[in-house]
A protein has these predicted regions:
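Consensus positions within tandem repeat domains that build extended binding/scaffold surfaces
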Residues: 21-24, 45-50, 69-74, 92-97, ...
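Structural signature of tandem-repeat unit edges
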Residues: 2-19, 29-43, 53-67, 77-90, ...
Length: 141
């Protein structure tokens, strides 16, 4: 990934970056509070933000991201809301597993499948919009 800036626990990923790699923020940036992802990013790798327990805000573009890897946000216990890009077609297994503060999820019409345990352990979930385009929801979700 291209060089990015973190200031006051806020990461701004530069335009031109196409992928956030597997486990990228998971091990070294646990105090990260916010991340802004540009439209050039098409893939968020598996476990990219795994256990980033301080992460409160993810600003994603409305389009661009096509793939969000399994367990990408597992254990992000401070995350409250998520609006997925209109270009995502599948919510992978355990994507938001144990995001215990997650209250609202907006799933776009482009999504056709929700993987197992995608929202397992999201004990504060108040609202989730599942469009008619979703034809498969795996068990334990």
């Amino acid at each position: 990934m291209a060089k990015f800036e973190i200031k006051d626990d806020v990461a701004i990923i530069p335009e031109g970056t196409t992928e956030i790699g597997e486990w990228f923020f998971a091990r070294d940036y646990l105090s990260l509070k916010s991340v802004t992802i540009p439209e050039s990013v098409t893939k968020i790798g598996p476990n990219a933000f795994h256990q980033c327990t301080s992460l409160e805000s993810i600003v994603m573009p409305l389009k661009g991201i096509k793939e969000i890897g399994y367990s990408a946000f597992t254990g992000c216990s401070s995350l409250k809301n998520i609006i997925l890009p209109k270009s995502v077609t599948k919510i992978e297994e355990s994507t938001f597993n144990n995001c215990i503060s997650l209250k609202n999820v907006n799933i776009p019409k482009s999504v056709t499948e929700i993987g197992w345990s995608a929202f397992s352990g999201c004990t504060s979930l108040e609202s989730i919009s599942i469009p008619e385009s979703v034809t498969k929801i795996e068990r334990s979700t």
